[in-house]
Amino acid sequence: MNSCQQKAMEKLLHGHGCANQLLIMDQTESDSSMEREDLAKSVLHCFSDALSILIDTNDHQDDQSNNSSPQDSSPVLESSRKPLHKRGRKTSMAESSDYHRHESSTPIYHDGFLWRKYGQKQIKESEYQRSYYKCAYTKDQNCEAKKQVQKIQHNPPLYSTTYFGQHICQLHQAYATFPIDTSDFEEHEGSHMIRFGHPNISFSSSTSNLRQHQNHQDRIKDEYMKPVIAEDWSPSQWMSSEVALAVEAFEFNPFWTSHDLSS
């Protein structure tokens, strides 16, 4: 027991003694009203002093905890900060308004873009792993487009492909809209597109609209992605710088005909 607690205890004991004396006077029917008043005041003062001591002691302990050194509190602060920071990284991509989610009966790997897988992990409350991809031109052309692929249902099979960001790489500048893989839409007409963050653009789940969209993209490919003559072809226009150097070293042109190769 520290000194403050000892003082408070002494005050309480003294007040308790005064209260007992006051009780005895009531039982003996003493006529000394002045003595009764003094004892009652003593009881109140003792209790007030004891309460003041206890309150001051509690306030002093709170001040010490608030003024503790950063070294003493750093483990607690770090442990409380890290989960918040980690949650921020996990939700930053999901909270982005510029993303599209597509569900289909088979995973979409060939969607008209070049991707590089950079991770795969098990997701909580899901028995299927999620794969993470980023644009193959992230370093060469600072394209930050990403996508996630995950199986979400076994029977019937259902896969979710989520796209984040927009492609800015030159290879895909011809694509003005979000690419859709319609290879299995003939057999699975229940596949549908969900798009967020662009209220002025809507995608219908009907097969006819999807076929029209695919035909539109085919025309874009024919117009923008094929050179008119073989001599106009340059590897640096269609692939990363490392691959382009290798192709140029072998003097290879994919648009040469058999006549060009034999001459």
Swiss-Prot record:
Main localization, broad class: nucleus
PROSITE patterns reported in the protein's UniProt record: WRKY
Compartmental location: Nucleus
Region (Disordered): 59-104
Keywords: DNA-binding, Nucleus, Transcription, Transcription regulation
Described function: Transcription factor. Interacts specifically with the W box (5'-(T)TGAC[CT]-3'), a frequently occurring elicitor-responsive cis-acting element.
Name under which the protein is recorded: Probable WRKY transcription factor 62
Organism: Arabidopsis thaliana (Mouse-ear cress)
Underlying gene: WRKY62
